[in-house]
């Protein structure tokens, strides 16, 4: 269920502070975060944010079409390798 428009987008305070610092400094260094629940806001466009997927930090280059989505949508947590193949049926 989507968040109410009157509440506005949710972004963790520590992440918002890091984003503002990176924008001021013009830094291209990835910002590490564990906050998959934070929404991408227009101030993040052009930054690289390393989002934790449970094992490692996945670098996500934020572009304009990502605004309004959550960071966790771009760092997959599951590794699907396909269904098991029956070797006898393959012959």
From Swiss-Prot:
Give the range the annotation lists for the signal sequence.
none
The protein's name is Small ribosomal subunit protein uS19
Cite the SUPFAM superfamilies for this sequence: Ribosomal protein S19 (SSF54570)
| PANTHER family, alphabetized | RIBOSOMAL PROTEIN S19P FAMILY MEMBER (PTHR11880), SMALL RIBOSOMAL SUBUNIT PROTEIN US19M (PTHR11880:SF8)
Q: Which Pfam families match?
A: Ribosomal_S19
* Organism taxonomic ancestry: Bacteria, Pseudomonadati, Pseudomonadota, Gammaproteobacteria, Oceanospirillales
Q: List the disulfide bonds.
A: none
Question: What superkingdom does the record give?
Answer: Bacteria
| Species for this entry | Alcanivorax borkumensis (strain ATCC 700651 / DSM 11573 / NCIMB 13689 / SK2)
């Amino acid at each position: 269920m989507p968040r109410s428009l009157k509440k506005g987008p949710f972004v963790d305070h520590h992440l918002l502070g890091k984003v503002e610092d990176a924008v001021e400094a013009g830094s291209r260094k990835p910002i590490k975060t564990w906050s998959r629940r934070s929404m991408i806001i227009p101030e993040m466009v052009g930054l690289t944010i390393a989002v934790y997927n449970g094992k490692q930090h996945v670098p996500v280059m934020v572009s304009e079409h990502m605004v309004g989505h959550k960071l966790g949508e771009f760092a997959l947590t599951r590794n699907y390798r396909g269904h098991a193949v029956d070797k006898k049926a393959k012959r």
